[in-house]
Amino acid sequence: MNPAPNLVMIGPMGAGKSSIGRRIAKHFSLHFADTDHAIVERAGTNISAIFKYSGEPEFRRLEREVLHDLLNHENQLIATGGGTILDPENRRCMQERGFVVFLKINVNTQLERLAHDRYRPLLQQIDRKQVLSDLYATRQPLYQQIADMIVTTDHMSPNTATAQLILDLTAHWQKSSNAA
């Protein structure tokens, strides 16, 4: 058993961090928090507008602030944005205050799941596959570096992935307080 006060879901966009995370949070009686939603609430505008008018550095600053605020609490499942792991301080904090679950997905499955998504700023490019491939190459090693558990969600329905994660988490994670 690996005790931690929070569960933290990491992985690329489209992996299921939010949809599966909500189900896992309910099963384990955890508060569900999504960093992207918390950023929108804090900024008072959507993520696309933050990127457009303030730039990615401002978005990443807000992301770091929100993540650290969330991780100061306990009994939560935190679904992070795909790029949250780019900041070394975010990685350190997630490892210290959470049991980190990497939801892994391949680029082709991402393309299928995100085919109709027009809201993610990093996908507003002509060649989405190249963008996702580049993000995968940069971020994959960082996801693996901090993961306590890796679950591949390719070819899994949300129900199947949730059931598998519940089994895996029951075997490997113990909810604790003051684990940091």
From Swiss-Prot:
Binding residue positions for ATP: 14-19, 120
Disulfide-bonded cysteines: none
Entry GO CC: cytosol
Superkingdom, natural source: Bacteria
Matches recorded under PROSITE patterns: SHIKIMATE_KINASE
PANTHER family (UniProt xref): SHIKIMATE KINASE (PTHR21087), SHIKIMATE KINASE 1, CHLOROPLASTIC (PTHR21087:SF16)
Protein name: Shikimate kinase
Organism: Xylella fastidiosa (strain 9a5c)
Designated gene of the protein: aroK
